[in-house]
C-alpha cells in the first residue's frame, strides 16, 4: 500500500492486504459501502414498469482496469407495474461500474451491511471483505440467465 500510495502521490490508507504470510501485500478493497438515501424501498419499486429486484448476490467478478463486472443473482423477483411478482434466480447482472453508478436514479433509506461472506480475489490471492448498501434503482444493466 505504501508503494502504491507513493506512486500515486496520496496518503497510505491501510489497504495493503495478503491472504497468507507467504504472499506480498497488494492494494485491495476491505469494505464497499453506499450511503442511504431518503426514499422508501416500496416507493422506488412502485416506479418501475419492468425490472429485476435483486435480493441476494453471489460470485461476482470485476475487470479492474475497465470497470466491467458481472454478479450472479442468487435470488430476486421480477418487478411488473410497480409490484414484486415472480421469483427469479440464477441470472447474471452485467455492467460497467462507473456507468452503473452514474445510472443510479433513486436510493432507499434501508441501508444495511451484508451478512454474507465475500472474498476479494486478486493476483491469485483471496481475502475476506464485506459490503453494504441500501436498495438502489439502476436504470440500465444487462440481465441474463434463466427464470
Q: Where does each model-flagged region fall?
A:
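N-terminal small-residue-enriched
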Residues: 1-147
Amino acid at each position: 500500500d505504501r508503494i502504491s500510495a507513493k506512486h500515486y502521490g496520496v496518503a497510505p490508507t491501510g489497504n495493503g492486504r495478503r491472504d497468507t504470510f507467504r504472499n506480498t501485500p497488494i492494494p485491495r478493497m476491505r469494505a464497499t459501502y453506499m450511503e442511504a438515501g431518503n426514499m422508501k424501498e416500496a416507493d422506488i419499486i412502485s416506479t418501475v414498469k419492468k425490472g429485476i429486484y435483486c435480493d441476494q448476490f453471489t460470485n461476482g467478478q470485476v475487470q479492474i482496469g475497465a470497470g466491467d463486472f458481472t454478479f450472479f443473482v442468487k435470488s430476486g423477483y421480477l418487478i411488473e407495474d410497480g409490484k414484486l411478482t415472480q421469483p427469479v434466480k440464477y441470472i447474471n447482472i452485467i455492467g460497467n461500474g462507473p456507468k452503473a453508478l452514474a445510472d443510479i436514479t433513486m436510493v432507499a433509506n434501508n441501508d444495511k451491511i451484508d451478512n454474507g461472506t465475500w472474498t476479494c480475489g486478486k493476483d491469485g490471492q483471496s481475502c475476506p471483505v464485506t459490503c453494504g448498501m441500501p436498495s438502489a434503482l439502476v436504470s440500465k444493466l444487462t440481465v441474463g440467465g434463466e427464470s
